[in-house]
Design a protein with these regions (language model features):
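N-terminal active-site segment of His-dependent metallophosphoesterases
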Residues: 1-65, 197
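A short acidic, amphipathic alpha-helical/loop segment
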Residues: 62-68, 87-88, 155, 165
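Active-site HxH/HxHxD metal-binding segment of metal-dependent hydrolases
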Residues: 70-90
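Short catalytic/ligand-binding loop motif for oxyanion handling, primarily in non-cytosolic enzymes
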Residues: 10-13, 60-62, 82-86, 148-150, ...
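Conserved beta-sheet core of the metallophosphoesterase superfamily
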Residues: 91-93, 98-109, 114-206
Length: 206
């Protein structure tokens, strides 16, 4: 499975926040970042590859560019993925995770319901994640990092707390996340899948 996140197609301000984006595009001979990113990613991902996108696909009308991305894509909803965009992604065959999905043979479902009962509906809808075993690792995939030490993200602390409870309930080994771009949180259980820290190459799990 290939993993990408925070493509932010059409998000011109992101080129100011993360100048490495346009620098990388120009280094590869492109002036248009979206054109660069789509072609670059498609060099690594083929049409039949299973792909997990960890959120924040596109801004404004650039969401329609998503149909150019290769792969059989599952999207874990991020904070910038609007409902109009999600409806379009569904129409082009993407699978959408917009809640808590646990793909384990055994876990305490009753305990999960007790955990969920402590949170309001907005927090639950904002906490999209997938837990599954790959090889000998139990992984929680999410848009937000489970153990987030970035003070800028204090507004997401309810989501973070819920993610931590799910991580502990499922006895996960690692968290593969997006959202933080070039910032890497201090907790080594969190693996940043963002393009900026991976030379714009999709991560891969076997």
């Amino acid at each position: 499975m290939k993993i990408i996140t925070d493509t932010h197609l059409g998000h011109t301000n992101m080129l100011l926040y993360e100048p490495i984006r346009i620098q990388k595009a120009r280094m590869e001979g492109y002036e248009d970042f979206d054109e660069f990113l789509i072609e670059w990613i498609n060099d690594y991902i083929k049409k039949n590859d299973e792909v997990l996108h960890l959120g924040d696909v596109a801004f404004d009308n650039a969401y329609k560019l998503a149909k150019k991305l290769n792969g059989k894509i599952t999207l874990i909803k991020g904070n910038h993925d609007k409902q109009k965009h999600i409806d379009f992604y569904k129409s082009i065959g993407w699978r959408i995770i917009d809640g808590i999905e646990i793909e384990l043979n055994e876990f305490d479902k009753e305990c999960l319901e007790k955990i969920k009962s402590k949170y309001d509906n907005k927090t639950l809808s904002d906490t999209a994640c997938l837990v599954k075993e790959i090889g000998d690792k139990r992984i929680l995939f999410s848009h937000y990092p489970v153990f987030n030490d970035n003070s800028y993200d204090e507004k997401y602390q309810k989501v973070t707390k819920l993610l931590q409870e799910i991580f502990n309930l499922c006895e996960c080994d690692i968290n593969i996340h997006g959202h933080t771009h070039s910032y890497c949180v201090g907790d080594k259980r969190c693996v940043n899948a963002c393009l900026e820290v991976n030379d714009f190459v999709p991560m891969e799990t076997n």
